[in-house]
Amino acid sequence: ILIPLTVYVFFKNRMEGDRGPVFFTQNRIGKNGKEFKMYKYRTMELGADKILEDLMAKDPAIREEYLKNKKLANDPRITSAGRFLREKSLDEFPQFINVFFGQMSLIGPRPYLPKEKIDMGEYYEDVVACKPGITGMWQSHGRSDVSFEHRLVLDEYYYRNWSFWLDVTLLCKTVKQVLYGRGAV
């Protein structure tokens, strides 16, 4: 499945004049706070961090939204190929490489950015006590519609209430969310 998606992203980006890499790696916080490189399809324009800095400097509303949610609802940095991948959660597919290497599991808390550690506050220890997952509580309970604080509450709930049946339930809910495209992008 990675091969056809990779070919799609490559050609779609090239048709739009984007010569950047197809894949994107980013340091994330793993189990017990150990950092690892997480793989994703690149869904944003090159220089996305600089673009975000400029947007936040020019527009206080964007700055407030990003500081509250750690994301933008209508992020102008997303490429058209990236929008399609995010709507179907296909941008996460390369994370199976991280699962293969034992850095992630299929289901678990979201792998947070190292710069978000401070913002995680009291939730940090519980969230990093288990392997991060490709999907989990917040992905199956609203995805991008969930605030950063609510994500942490959901991830802590997962840690404190983990069971095989919770994982089965989350997997089914994630499939439903992806099929109906709720909370994507």
Regions found by a protein language model. Give the residues of each.
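A hydrophobic, helix-centered structural microdomain
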Residues: I1-D49, F164, T169-V185
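Residue-level detector of functionally special positions within alpha-helical transmembrane segments
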Residues: L2-P4, S89, G133
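Gly/Ser/Thr-rich helix-start
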Residues: P21, K31, R83, Q103, ...
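Short, glycine-rich, amphipathic interfacial segments at transmembrane boundaries or analogous
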Residues: F23-P76, T135-L154
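Short amphipathic alpha-helical interaction/hinge segments
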Residues: D49-L52, G108-P111, G183
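A short, structured surface patch at a secondary-structure boundary
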Residues: E65-C130, L170-Q177
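C-terminal terminal-structure detector
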Residues: E122-V185
